Amino acid sequence: MSLDEKYILYYFDVNARGCIIRALLSYVKANWENKVIEYNDFVQNYKHKKEFCEYGQLPILEYKGKYYSQSMAIILFLGKKYNLMGDNEDEEYEINNLLCSFEDIFPLIHDQNQEKKSAKYEKVRRYFKIYEEKYLKHVKENKGKKYYFANDKFTLADIYFGALIYSMLNSLKEIEMEKEFPELKKLLDFYKSDNALKEFYEKYYINSIF
């Protein structure tokens, strides 16, 4: 890959949505730079530059002189580019189905109001009580020897789940995964230990900060 094909990911020093893109770029071993921006720097020097920051928010992915915005659009762009969306339309549907369900949890946790913390934890618990069985069903129906969601290989669904969901739940100390969701914990631990995401966790994962 030539220098003009290098990716630059602009994001804050947190996991959140940016961690999925970091994990994805790490997994495909892309030539990329993890450009961490302080919030005040973003507001003063980046937010109002429409040619750079179309919607006034991060993450932004720079590639070949173009600035890509909106995290899910970036994730799908990279997923398609690196053949992580399945081998046919049915597999792509299954992966997109899972991605949409993963997105459902994001509003439950992305609340900065400290007074709502206990309510937030209960919402997250309810979500996983409903969805844990569904997620594990996908893995079992895949019939592979590993914990993959589709096509018995690593796909965008695995990267999303292994990066964002792990970091999200790891930041919620009030939820004891091993006691409350033991099977889901095994699945998450598999993603953390698997070589596919090893570089992400060693270099780019931000411990206990969602």
Which functions belong to the PLM regions below?
Residues 78, 87-90, 94, 98-196:
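GST-like fold's C-terminal all-alpha helical module
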Residues 60, 67, 147, 196-199:
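Conserved beta-strand positions that form and line the central face of beta-propeller blades
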Residues 1-119, 126:
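GST-like domain detector, emphasizing the conserved glutathione-binding G-site
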Residues 2, 185, 190-210:
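C-terminal helix/juxtamembrane-tail motif
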Residues 7-9, 174-175, 199:
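Short, contiguous strand/loop micro-motifs
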